[in-house]
Amino acid sequence: MRLRTEVRDLWATADSQEVRVGDARILVRELSADSLDFVVTSPPYWNILHKEDHKAKQERVSHDLDTRYSDHKHDLGNIPKYETFLYELASILGACGKALKPKKYMAVIVSDFRDKSRFVLFHADLAHALEPYGFEMRGLSVLYQRHKRIFPYGYPYAYVPNIHHQFILILQNVKK
C-alpha cells in the first residue's frame, strides 16, 4: 500500500520483494558477508505512535490501524528514551555494513519529528550515529509526501509547521 501511495508511478515496474519477519538484530546476522549491493530501509520513528497527542497515532486510529506493533521489550517502538532508541537502531543498521559490499550504499528513509515542543532532527542524529560503523553520508534527498493533509497546529498562538516530507539518507559503506 505504501509503495502505491509514495511512488505510484513506479508501481507497475516493481517485480517482487522478499520480506523477512522477525527481530532485525537476529535477521541481519543471517546475511552473508559482502552479499548485498544496496540496502534500503525505513525504520521506526522511536515511540511516536505511543504518544496520545500525536497526529500519526490519531490518523492510524481513524483508519483502524495498529498504534502499537507489539508489547515486546526489544521492539524499537517501545524504547522509552530517544538516546537508547538511537543507539539500538544504529547498531542494527551498522550491522548491515558486514553484509553490504565495500563502497556500496545504504538508503535510509526517515522523518524528523516532534517530541512535545522539542523538534527532533532524527535524520541528522542517525547519520552521525552510523559514522562509527563505517557509514559516511554521501547525500540527502527529500521525499515530498504530496498526499499528506495540512493541519493548523498551534494556530493562532504559535507557529508549528506540518511535516510533509521525509529524508533519504544516502550512506556509503567505506570499509575496505
Stretches with model-predicted labels:
Residues 1-176:
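Class I S-adenosyl-L-methionine-dependent methyltransferase catalytic core
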